[in-house]
């Protein structure tokens, strides 16, 4: 029997489960499969919780997000057939655009739906155990790992840590942006807020403190004009460059189409490995990427 632990069960943990179940159903894994999932929260959605504000959007177009692999990812292998995010929206009656950007609430519902789809496919040779606890300790032995929860101790052959971004321990008052409903709820118009960074998390916080506070955008002469509600705090945003992220380009890919790399690909890496005994990231790899 193969015993596997998955610690944290958002989208990354769900992807691990999909791969394990696919390989078992495709007989790549021959042993009986026993999977232990450690997560006290809703399973599958992770940071895309259906309980958050519907104002918060996903940063990827609908047709390019899926939990289910296909022949472009796993050639000559068995794979579980399932919908991508765009196909899921259509099946639920939404008038979705394959290149549209939708809320994390909807993505969370898709992820939780995908988890249930995978569960229904599990045979008698696949056992999935849900441990509604935080994993507090992982001890590596010679041939196995011991995962200790608050009240549970499990021995597994392999352990996957898919906990997402963890918080650092700081000696000064700096707060995490998430969950946004908690981090922004007690902020008033009299407050001054500092936001370190100009990425996606900054956009989330600014959205909650502006349009989430009753402000709204109005289109006039092909320009978006923001109309404040008067409830917004003073917002100071800073980063190393003090420049916002570049906007996403309009996608030109079809659904499930893969970009074909020209410079940084497996053929180039094989040539470099023949030429150099050990690759230097800065000298051989980084120039191919940038």
Where are the model-predicted features located?
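Extreme N-terminal starter segment of soluble prokaryotic enzymes
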Residues: 1-4
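Short, charged/polar micro-motifs that form catalytic or ligand-binding hotspots
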Residues: 6-7, 97-105, 149, 189, ...
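Core beta-strand elements of the Rossmann-like FAD/NAD(P) dinucleotide-binding domain
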Residues: 149-158
């Amino acid at each position: 029997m193969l015993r596997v632990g998955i610690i944290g069960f958002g989208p990354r943990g769900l992807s691990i489960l999909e791969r394990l179940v696919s390989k078992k159903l495709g007989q790549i894994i021959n042993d009986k499969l026993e999977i232990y999932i450690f997560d006290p929260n809703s399973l599958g959605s992770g940071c895309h919780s259906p309980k958050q504000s519907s104002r918060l959007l996903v940063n990827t177009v609908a047709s390019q997000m899926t939990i289910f692999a296909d022949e472009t990812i796993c050639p000559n292998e068995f794979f579980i057939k399932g919908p991508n995010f765009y196909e899921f929206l259509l099946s639920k009656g939404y008038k979705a655009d394959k290149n549209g950007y939708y809320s994390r609430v909807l993505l969370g519902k898709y992820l939780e739906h995908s988890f249930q789809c995978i569960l229904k496919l599990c045979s008698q040779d696949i056992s999935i155990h849900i441990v509604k606890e935080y994993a507090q300790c992982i001890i590596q032995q010679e041939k196995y790992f011991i995962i200790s929860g608050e009240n549970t101790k499990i021995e597994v052959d392999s352990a996957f840590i898919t906990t997402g971004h963890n918080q650092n321990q700081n000696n000064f008052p700096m707060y995490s942006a998430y969950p946004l409903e908690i981090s922004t709820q007690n902020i008033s118009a009299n407050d001054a807020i500092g936001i370190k960074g100009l990425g996606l998390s900054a956009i989330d916080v600014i959205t909650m403190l502006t349009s989430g506070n009753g402000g709204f955008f109005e289109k006039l002469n092909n320009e978006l004009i923001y109309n404040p509600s008067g409830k917004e705090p003073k917002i100071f945003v800073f980063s190393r460059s003090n420049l916002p992220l570049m906007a996403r380009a309009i996608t030109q890919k079809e659904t499930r189409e893969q970009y074909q790399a020209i410079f940084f690909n497996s053929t180039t890496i094989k040539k470099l490995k023949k030429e150099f005994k050990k690759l230097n990231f800065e000298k051989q790899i980084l120039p191919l990427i940038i």
